[in-house]
Amino acid sequence: MTDQEQGQEEHKLIAQRREKLTKLRERGVAFPNDFRRNVMSGELHAEYDAKPAEFFEQNAIRVSVAGRMMAKRIMGKASFTQILDMSGRIQLFIQRDSLPDGAYSDFKTWDVGDILGAEGTLFKTKTGELTVNVDSLRLLTKSLRPLPEKFHGLSDTETRYRQRYVDLIMNEPVRETFRTRTRVIQFIRQFLDQRGFLEVETPMMQAIPGGATARPFATHHHALDMQLFLRIAPELYLKRLVVGGFERVYEINRNFRNEGLSTRHNPEFTMVEFYEAYANYHDLMDLTEDLLRDLTLEVLGSTQVHYQGETYDFERPFTRMTVKESILQHNPDVSEAELADLERARAVAQRLGIPLKDSYGLGKVWIEIFEKTVEGNLKDPTFITAYPTEVSPLARRNDEDPFVTDRFEFFVGGREIANGFSELNDYEDQAERFRKQVQEKEAGDDEAMHFDADYLRALEHGMPPTAGEGIGIDRLVMLLTDSPSIRDVLLFPHMRPES
């Protein structure tokens, strides 16, 4: 069947269903809201699947269930149907003689996709399937659009993303992915709560977008006649709270970055960001190991994570190496001496086919080499540490080597999952780094940071030694659900306008 023929068939079915809805309206029974369910299908299966048929013959278990009709098999005076609710499916057995006059005839006109309410008693069929023997049946919502059952579910990827509501109806693995996402967020929240962290909310609209190097979304506040930005990170507000005495804080919320779309990037994404006073980046690496090990056990029942044909072990201690060490390890033809000099490092990048801007210093050149030759190869759980100060404007300089900072990023499967560091609490150093960021912005770097005078004022009051970290929830869920694209773990990912 061609796309045009499918479209014509769908319009025909919609017209037929509209006629049925018109008749329901005429009878005054369209869209009732007085049916009450007392149990979910998943609860019934959990409690009664193991019971033998004799149990139901001896015990009349009466239930009231509701859900979307997903299958329908009419056999003369009796029929079977399956309804889907949030927890799963349950089978209904419907007999003409068990229903009020006319109810069975009405049922035969109903369509797959309609939402039903049913009351009756439980029994087991000859094949052992838990079933409701229905004695009261109502149509609660008439579905006008047919479900794509003829095509064995919804398989077109773009349609799945655009019409997630249909995707969720048709595909149980998709529903399970988003249940897992909820469990991941709940576990992270519980993990931090148990360790004395306070959950807070900070502004989503900010006069100065800070806390990360990224291009922001801009908007205008009409009442105040001022430009505002959707936040790219909550970092500077959370650290203001540390200054104010909330020594362990976290936030799980959205960030917005006006950048490209890819299988790993969405302009709107979810992060957990947390800060702990009197801790350093080593403490947070230890905490991250504990969090991810416990999380994989909770969600998967194992510390073995299977992703896109590869297996990652979250049980053993994670690998830790510096940016420089990783470059040398993955580029045997590059020497440490070459990485110590800007011009020689630029020559290395040129040899590797990596384009550079004239404004890049040695630290930025390192990162360009790292991102192009190392990052994608970091398959096993790995902490990369000692990021150059040039690319870490909010991180504390390392005491032994001020060229780098006390910063780490966590990688698995060749992608960054987390970023953390000992926080820069030296007011003068932070002010100087802000000034350098402003210079880069004036030179054309749209992702460079703004100068945030109020944040500096907060630092002048004194921020205790602190470490902070952000973990990308979306990428973490991708990993734990074996999802190849970030769009697979976002209920409503951003899409180009429909043609």
Curated annotation (Swiss-Prot):
Q: Which InterPro entries match?
A: Aa-tRNA-synt_II (IPR004364), aa-tRNA-synth_II (IPR006195), aa-tRNA-synth_II/BPL/LPL (IPR045864), Lys-tRNA-ligase_II (IPR002313), Lys-tRNA-ligase_II_N (IPR044136), Lys-tRNA-synth_II_C (IPR018149), NA-bd_OB-fold (IPR012340), NA-bd_OB_tRNA (IPR004365)
**Predominant location category:** cytoplasm
Q: Which CDD domains match?
A: LysRS_core, LysRS_N
Check the record and name the SUPFAM superfamilies matching this protein.
Answer: Class II aaRS and biotin synthetases, Nucleic acid-binding proteins
Q: Which reaction does it catalyse?
A: tRNA(Lys) + L-lysine + ATP = L-lysyl-tRNA(Lys) + AMP + diphosphate
Q: Name one GO molecular function term.
A: ATP binding
**Which principal EC class is assigned to this enzyme?**
ligase
Quaternary state and interactors: Homodimer.
Q: PANTHER family recorded for this chain?
A: LYSINE--TRNA LIGASE, CHLOROPLASTIC_MITOCHONDRIAL, LYSYL-TRNA SYNTHETASE
| NCBIfam families registered for this protein in UniProt | lysS_bact, PRK00484.1
- The protein's name is Lysine--tRNA ligase
Gene name as annotated: lysS
